[in-house]
């Protein structure tokens, strides 16, 4: 087996070895074509051809594009092997921004409120990536003025959460996760920040003329503010 983690990239692999002996301890040779190494879950798992590397010793590689534990059992067309099995652990590869995404909630926030950003970090094979040290998300757009973002909280399942405190400016807000100064999602998440409810204390009404005779008209102006 490799000395370190084996990445689920379809390239790095474990080497499984089966030593076959008879009841007297003698090597059982010539069985390569009748042996099988079978994964319990074949999704994303590739088992190489079995070869006899020395008398009675059989070997094959196992790779995967699926992170997590892979249980492999050994079978023989000729002999009863019992429950010979091995558990192999594959880990996610490096972050792939093209396979990662970010969402914002709520989708129509109000100025002065908060927005929750959820970043889903994945590798090139859509495995969740957890061991990262991302920077705080970047903010852009009109509503970014006066807005601030917290750092990310690792949820432990490949998702990360950050809180954005909005400023007093309405308009579009774009949020992008960053890792080592680079974009960490395929696209930025966008929302439109809207003005707060109309405030009677801040809004004003003005009339062009103080005194208007019956039947005449005047202009009334409402300056609406939140």
Describe the residue ranges of each PLM region.
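Short S/T/G/P-enriched beta-strand
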Residues: 1-29, 41-42, 55, 66-130, ...
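Assembly/interface hotspot detector across virion components, adhesins/toxins, and nucleic-acid enzymes
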Residues: 50, 104, 152-154
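A broad, low-specificity signal marking well-ordered, structured residues that form hydrophobic/aromatic
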Residues: 35, 58, 86, 137, ...
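Aromatic sugar-binding surface patches on proteins
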Residues: 53-60, 155-163
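Short amphipathic beta-strand segments in non-cytosolic proteins
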Residues: 34-49, 135-150
């Amino acid at each position: 087996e490799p000395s370190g983690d084996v990445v689920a990239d379809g390239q790095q692999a474990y080497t499984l070895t089966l030593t076959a002996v008879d009841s007297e301890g003698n090597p059982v040779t010539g069985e390569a074509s009748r042996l099988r190494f079978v994964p319990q879950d074949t999704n994303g798992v590739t088992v190489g051809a079995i070869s006899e590397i020395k008398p009675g010793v059989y070997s094959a590689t196992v790779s995967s594009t699926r992170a997590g534990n892979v249980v492999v059992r050994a079978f023989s067309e000729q002999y009863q092997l019992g429950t010979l099995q091995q558990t192999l652990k594959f880990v996610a590869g490096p972050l792939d921004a093209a396979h990662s995404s970010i969402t914002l909630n709520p989708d129509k926030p109000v100025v002065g409120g908060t927005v929750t950003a959820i970043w889903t970090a994945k590798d090139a094979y859509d495995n969740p990536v957890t061991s990262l040290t991302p920077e705080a998300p970047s903010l852009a757009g009109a509503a970014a003025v006066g807005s601030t973002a917290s750092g990310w909280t690792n949820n432990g399942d490949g998702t990360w959460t950050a809180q954005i405190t909005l400023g007093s400016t309405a308009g579009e807000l774009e949020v992008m996760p960053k890792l080592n100064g680079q974009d960490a999602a395929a696209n930025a998440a966008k929302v439109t920040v809207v003005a707060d409810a109309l405030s009677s204390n801040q809004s004003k009404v003005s009339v062009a003329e103080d005194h208007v005779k019956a039947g005449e008209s005047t202009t009334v102006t409402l300056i609406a503010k939140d």
